[in-house]
Each structure stands twice: as structure tokens, then as C-alpha cells.
């Protein structure tokens, strides 16, 4: 039962959820496979949207190939920087990607930076490229979050809501377990189980909704200017991440504070992008229409 995962209020019980398997003597983490699937799906989505909007698909294939490396490096760097108290004592683990430790906001920063630089070098429109690339980015997040499911990580505090997830205490890190979890813990077959918010699932479902809205905006020519779809991504993802991050028990904190860095970043990006959307909708494009009339 030590590798089981259950959603008791949904009547779902998974007796054996593996973290890794071995091929020719080499251990392969399911987390890594999940991330790879997310990357591949995101690549396809960006190329698909580029084709539908009359852009050169090759530009997005090239961008994707570069973005894989920059996204992974930035995702790892973000996690290591805000977990430095641990990694300064275990420096050899900094380059070990197999067990997790990738921060999605880091991957966003890496992917966005890569898209802007690539567009400038190729003399393309950075804002248009961000509008297209963000659809692939959010699909990658929808799938990639399931890596946390297999790793039994990135969960929230105790809950008994409909989606509550039950995990063996022995399968999670001790520093992610709260007092309330232990108060509500159950003994089943000699094993101690805790019940938590499946925040990975919340974020995956939230991002799926964001993706659907972005695709509708793209299809219906909703945007008033290049870059607006990307701003809507930052706004909607930021709102969801701010809420979900507040539930988690493994938050990366701003040094010397109790402030969750991803929650702070989500708030800043959501507010900033929301203001820019208002400016695009009611100031910049409005002024342009008045001048034409």
C-alpha cells in the first residue's frame, strides 16, 4: 500500500502508482516522461496555431527546440535559487533533474525570454510570437503538472473536499506534512495515510480552461493588438496560480520572509497584465479608432 494513491470521495483507488522504472539497468523517472510529453504536446500546439494563423511553422519548430533547453535550465535554476539553503549543502544534486525540482514559473521565464530574443534576431514580431507560443506553453503545463502526481509532491494542506487525495505518509517528504494532516491521518492496514488538496490537479484543470479560452480568442480574432493573447495568459494563469499556491505546503519562499515567491510573482504578473489589457482595449486601440474617424 506504500505506493498507492486514492481519491476516496470519488471512489478512486490506485494500488500501484510507480515513480520510476528500469530499462537496461537505467532508472527512468515517470516525472521526466510526463515533462517530455508536455513539451512535445506544447511544441505541436504552437506549430498548429502558427499554421492556422498564417505564420511560418518552421520558426516555431526552431523556437521550440531552443526553448526546451532554456525552459528546463530556467525551471531548474528558479527552483535551486529559492531552495538554496538545501542546495548549498548538496551542490552535486543541482544538476539532478530526475527526481523533480522544476519550477514552472522558471520555465515560463525561460520560454518567454527565448521567444522574444528569437523574434528580435529573426526580425519577427515578438508580441505575435508570444501570442502563439503561449498556447503551447500552457498545454505543456497542463500535462507537465501530472509529474507531481507520480512524485507525490506539490500538494496542499488537509481537505475533505470532493477531489481530496489520500497518500501514504511514508511516500512524502516530512517537511511537507502539517500538524492538521497528522491530526486527520488514518491508519489502514498498518500504514498511515494523509489526505490533501491535489493542487497539481487543480492547476492542470485550471490551465486546461485557460488553454480553451486562449484558443477561442485566437480563433475568433478577439485580440485588439499583438501581444494581447499572451497578456490574457499571464492574467488567467496568474489568478489560478495565486490561489493554488496559497494551498500548497511546499512553497518556495522569498529569502528571509514567509512570502511565497510564486504567489508574489503571480500577483504581480496578473495585475500588470490586467492593466496592460485595459490600456490596449480602452486607451491605445480606442485612441487609434478616434484618429481614423
Specify the residue positions occupied by each region the protein language model found.
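A feature for loop-to-transmembrane-helix boundaries and adjacent hydrophobic helices
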Residues: 1-293
Amino acid at each position: 500500500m506504500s505506493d498507492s494513491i486514492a481519491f476516496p470521495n470519488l471512489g478512486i483507488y490506485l494500488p500501484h502508482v510507480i515513480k520510476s522504472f528500469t530499462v537496461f539497468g537505467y532508472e527512468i523517472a515517470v516525472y521526466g516522461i510526463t515533462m517530455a510529453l508536455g513539451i512535445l504536446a506544447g511544441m505541436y500546439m504552437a506549430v498548429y496555431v502558427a499554421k492556422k494563423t498564417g505564420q511560418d511553422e518552421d520558426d516555431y519548430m526552431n523556437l521550440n527546440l531552443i526553448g526546451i533547453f532554456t525552459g528546463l535550465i530556467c525551471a531548474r535554476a528558479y527552483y535551486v535559487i529559492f531552495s538554496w539553503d538545501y542546495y548549498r549543502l548538496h551542490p552535486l544534486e543541482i544538476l539532478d533533474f530526475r527526481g523533480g525540482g522544476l519550477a514552472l514559473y522558471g520555465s515560463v521565464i525561460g520560454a518567454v525570454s527565448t521567444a522574444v530574443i528569437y523574434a528580435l534576431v529573426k526580425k519577427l514580431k515578438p508580441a505575435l510570437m508570444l501570442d502563439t507560443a503561449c498556447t503551447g506553453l500552457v498545454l505543456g503545463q497542463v500535462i507537465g503538472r501530472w509529474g507531481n502526481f507520480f512524485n507525490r509532491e506539490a500538494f496542499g494542506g488537509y481537505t475533505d473536499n470532493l477531489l481530496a487525495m489520500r497518500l501514504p505518509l511514508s511516500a512524502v517528504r516530512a517537511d511537507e506534512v502539517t500538524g492538521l494532516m497528522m491530526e486527520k491521518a488514518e491508519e489502514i492496514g498498518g500504514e498511515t495515510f494523509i489526505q490533501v488538496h491535489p493542487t497539481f490537479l487543480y492547476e492542470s484543470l485550471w490551465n486546461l480552461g485557460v488553454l480553451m479560452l486562449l484558443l477561442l480568442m485566437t480563433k475568433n480574432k478577439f485580440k485588439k493588438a499583438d501581444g494581447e493573447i499572451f497578456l490574457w495568459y499571464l492574467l488567467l494563469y496568474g489568478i489560478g496560480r495565486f490561489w493554488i499556491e496559497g494551498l500548497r505546503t511546499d512553497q518556495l519562499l522569498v529569502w528571509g520572509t514567509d512570502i511565497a515567491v510564486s504567489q508574489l510573482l503571480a500577483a504581480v504578473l496578473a495585475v500588470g497584465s490586467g492593466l496592460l489589457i485595459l490600456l490596449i482595449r480602452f486607451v491605445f486601440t480606442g485612441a487609434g479608432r478616434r484618429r481614423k474617424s
